[in-house]
Regions:
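Active-site-proximal cap/lid insertion segments
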Residues: 1-21, 30-168
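Active-site loops and adjacent core secondary-structure elements that bind or stabilize anionic groups
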Residues: 27
Length: 168
């Protein structure tokens, strides 16, 4: 069985100009100008949120042969309270229901991990474009950079994909 792809996890090599790169290019362009008064700039990136479509060079950073999937001991969920299991089950319904089993049976787990890591490297590259423009521009000496993110994604740990779980 192939894992669902239309509504859940999609990945592949695609060299398109996403909103992330557009944001990075625009921010880098603005940072070449000298600010004459206090200025606030927020630059948001979507990656590595789904879908995971990135240029091939980011996938190539993570050869499938080098990727290790998380261990799945039979007792892996024993330490999770019932409320945690229930929450994870509720958020794994619908299109995500049975996703872990499907992706493992289809032999696609390493590919999904590779795609997620490619997304992290892609956003790192986009952020690097912005920071390079800042540090090479006229505003580097009087600028504070603050970075934050919202959450990570479970990638098969405890047989769970997505977020919404009461474990790390």
């Amino acid at each position: 069985r192939e894992p669902p792809s239309s509504s859940v996890v999609q990945w592949g090599h695609e060299d398109i100009r996403t909103g992330d790169i557009e944001a990075a290019i625009k921010a880098a362009e603005i940072l070449t100008e000298e600010f004459t008064e206090p200025t606030f700039m927020a630059v948001g990136f979507s990656s590595p949120h789904l879908p995971w479509h990135f240029p091939k060079r980011f996938f190539d950073l993570y050869p499938l042969a080098d990727i290790k999937t998380p261990e799945q001991p039979f007792y892996d969920l024993y330490d999770v309270p019932e409320a945690g299991k229930t929450l994870a089950e509720l958020f794994s319904a619908g299109a995500w229901e049975g996703y872990h089993e499907k992706i493992v049976e289809a032999g696609k787990w390493k590919e999904a991990l590779q795609a997620y890591m490619a997304g992290i490297s892609k956003v790192d590259d986009d952020l690097g474009r912005v920071l390079d423009a800042l540090y090479n521009g006229p505003n580097a000496a009087n600028t504070i950079v603050v970075l934050w993110s919202d959450h990570g994604l479970h990638l098969g740990e405890k047989e769970h994909w997505k977020k919404h779980a009461l474990w790390e």
